[in-house]
Amino acid sequence: MVGLSRLRGGGLLLVLALLPLALDGKPLEEAPTAPSRIIPFSRPVRKQSQAVLDPMVHPERPAGSGDDGDSRRLEGLAKEALGDGCFGQRIDRICNVSGMGCNHVRTDPAPTALARIIPFSRPVRKESRAALDRMQQPG
């Protein structure tokens, strides 16, 4: 390996400039400039222009789907379901598993440690089984 002392000056810059080419085999794409990011939002957009811009702005949305992502277009149950989570987004995994999400509702309480351990601690007689079942499932 070439020592860093030999790469002083322009040598280190040359290595850094050629590093992306060595890794990918092609240069990195240039990031869009600030004016090119601002121009589409600086003036009103006609429907013809919107059809051209939409696939560029939202590539995951199929062309001609009619869905502009606006919640005002939703009606009935679909609109009600939008407000079930944090900021209008459903967070089922966080809410149901850990209880840390928004609008958390737990229907059944978690069994206590004692109720989880007792069935495995010793053989149970029929009389004891009825008492254990009442402890594990009150009501």
Curated annotation (Swiss-Prot):
Cellular compartments annotated? Secreted
Alphabetized GO MF terms? hormone activity; toxin activity
Q: Name one GO cellular component term.
A: extracellular region
Listed as disulfide-bonded, the cysteine pairs are: C86-C102
Q: Which UniProt keywords apply?
A: Disulfide bond, Hypotensive agent, Secreted, Signal, Toxin, Vasoactive, Vasodilator
Any one of the GO BP annotations: vasodilation
Highest taxon, organism lineage: Eukaryota
Signal peptide location = 1-25
Q: Where is this region: Disordered?
A: 45-72
Q: Which residues form the propeptide?
A: 26-75, 117-139
Q: In which tissues is it expressed?
A: Expressed by the venom gland.
Give the family, as the similarity comment puts it.
Answer: Belongs to the natriuretic peptide family.
Please give the function described in this protein's UniProt entry.
Answer: Snake venom natriuretic peptide that dose-dependently induces the rapid relaxation of rat aortic strips phenylephrine-precontracted. Acts by stimulating cGMP production in a dose-dependent manner (by probably activating NPR1 and/or NPR2). May also show potent hypotensive effects. A synthetic peptide (AA 77-108, where the Cys-95 is replaced by a Ser) increases sodium excretion and urinary volume in rat kidneys.
- Name of the protein in its database record: Natriuretic peptide Mc-NP
| Species of provenance | Micrurus corallinus
